[in-house]
A protein has these predicted regions:
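Catalytic core of membrane glycerolipid acyltransferases/transacylases, capturing the structured
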Residues: 1-51
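Non-catalytic C-terminal accessory region of glycerolipid acyltransferases
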Residues: 54-177
């Protein structure tokens, strides 16, 4: 899925897909979210904030080997304003390589939504100043509050068979396709 909001979209996807799949969903998430103890059992952490734990890669492999449906945001960060347009950053190839490795189909999801201008301006200022830490991430809780009582649209695409990701393109090219 795309990741326009950085919080509410993930919670909404988990709720909708969790109901449909009897709770058999897991999120591939920023390791910082492991500090939210109520959410942690549903999460497979990916290092974004510090040194990589030796257990994280094993947890990712176990998650993909399980019967759980994996919710992931291939850009790795929530959407940013680029050239005046709100869009995801470049998607990483992980969802393609894991689809091939584990023979899992990919179901594309599109979540319609946006954060405040403050959020996007802060993210762009930090990028322009060369600040590597994702300061904008610290404001995602505020963004959730700003978006309460709003309605969002989720579009669920047709499953893409894992066999689609053949050798005519690299996994990185498939991710951008």
């Amino acid at each position: 899925s795309n990741h326009p909001l950085g919080g509410q979209d993930g919670v909404a996807l988990g709720y909708i897909l969790g109901k449909h799949y009897n709770g058999n969903v897991r999120y591939l998430v920023n390791d910082l979210l492991m500090n939210l103890h109520g959410l942690a059992p549903l999460c497979i952490p990916i290092n974004k904030t510090g040194s990589q734990s030796r257990d994280f890669p094993k947890m990712v492999e176990a998650g993909f080997a399980s019967d759980n449906h994996i919710i992931m945001f291939p850009a790795g960060l929530c959407s940013r304003r680029q050239g005046g347009e709100i869009k995801d950053l470049e998607w990483k190839k992980t969802f393609v390589t894991k689809s091939i490795e584990t023979h899992r189909d990919v179901v594309p999801l599109h979540f319609e939504g946006r954060n405040s201008d403050f959020f996007y301006n802060l993210a762009n200022i930090c990028k322009a100043l060369g600040i590597n830490f994702n300061i904008a991430m610290l404001y995602l809780a505020d963004e959730m509050l700003k978006n309460r009582h709003k309605t969002f649209t989720l579009t669920i695409g047709k499953p893409i068979p894992w066999q689609t990701f053949d050798k005519t393109k690299t996994p990185a090219q498939w991710a951008q396709f």
